[in-house]
Amino acid sequence: MPAARQQRGAAVEAAARAQLEQAGLRLVAGNANYRGGELDLVMRDGPMLVFVEVRYRRDARFGGGAASVDFRKRRKLVLAAQLFLAAHPALAALPCRFDVVEASGEPPLLHWIRDAFRLDDC
């Protein structure tokens, strides 16, 4: 991945994290890499464990970032979440949800989609 694209991704993830923290969520982990995929942000929203996918699109004409979280990507996120929970058994009993923060434009505008998909969507 080109350096400029990596920097943009890191900046958008940091902005997403800041927005979620301002809304009261607390960071548990960031950029957690597993065999099946990566979890951009893992956060707590009260008793809820939240797996957050952050997606940036420079231009939203062809669907925003959330549109790129297709069936295949959702399956990878679920697998990564399962591996995360296996590695952190103290968190495994918490209720979980999957959120998406999509960003588009320059400067990026963020849109937080709570409960963007459920396990039965995978």
Swiss-Prot record:
Domain of life the protein comes from: Bacteria
GO molecular-function terms, A-Z: nucleic acid binding
Family per similarity comment = Belongs to the UPF0102 family.
Q: Which PANTHER family match?
A: UPF0102 PROTEIN YRAN
The name on file for this protein is UPF0102 protein XCC0710
